[in-house]
Design a protein with these regions (language model features):
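Bacterial N-terminal signal peptides that target proteins for export
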Residues: 1-11
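Cleavable N-terminal signal peptides
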Residues: 12-13, 23
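Short, low-complexity N-terminal intrinsically disordered segments enriched in polar/charged residues
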Residues: 19-54, 58, 153
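N-terminal, post-signal-peptide region of Sec/Tat-exported proteins
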Residues: 45-84
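A mature extracytoplasmic/lumenal domain signature
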Residues: 56-58, 66, 110-114, 126, ...
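Surface-exposed, charged secondary-structure patches
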Residues: 61, 73-121
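Short beta-strand edge/turn micro-motifs at domain boundaries
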Residues: 123-148
Length: 153
């Protein structure tokens, strides 16, 4: 029984990995949901507060989990903090996103790495809640975990 259960778990994990392993396999609707996430990351890399805010629902919030403690902030505060001009290059990368859509509501769950000057600074999991307003997907809230024990990528 134990071996059978293990085989079922491994088969399920393998199937889940195959389903979420490629961004190229995303449907057009999933790509539309991922577009505002990419736009926010592009704004972050440019250190452009206005570009960071563009794909965000006004009044939205973030919860950043660090060392088991939540830090909450508004999208405006996040954009002002990350959107300040600076000399360091920042980049956030997600991979293997899991996208779920129901009418005008979507969720994206994805592992991420945050790079500073090309080196992994921290990693974790991003969770984006999105809403479709007037035909356009907007990020309504973000939660993430962040830890330093990442393998260098």
């Amino acid at each position: 029984k134990i071996i059978r259960r293990l085989c079922l778990v491994l088969a399920g994990a393998t199937a889940a990995g195959l389903l979420t392993s490629s961004l190229h396999a995303a449907t057009p609707e999933e790509q539309a949901v991922l577009a505002p996430v990419k736009a926010m990351f592009d704004g972050m890399a440019k250190r452009d507060a206005a570009a960071i805010k563009e794909p965000l629902l006004p009044g939205g919030t973030m919860v950043l989990m660090r060392d088991g403690k939540p830090t909450q902030m508004t999208f405006d505060a996040f954009a002002e903090r990350v959107g300040r001009p600076g000399t360091t290059h920042i980049e956030e990368r997600i991979h293997d996103p899991l996208v779920r859509i129901d009418n005008d509501l979507a969720v994206v769950w994805a592992p991420f790495e945050f790079l500073v000057d090309g080196k992994v600074d921290h990693c974790g999991t991003d969770l984006f809640n999105l809403v479709r307003q007037d035909g356009k997907w907007l990020i309504a809230s973000v939660a993430d975990t962040g830890r330093k024990d990442c393998a260098a990528k």
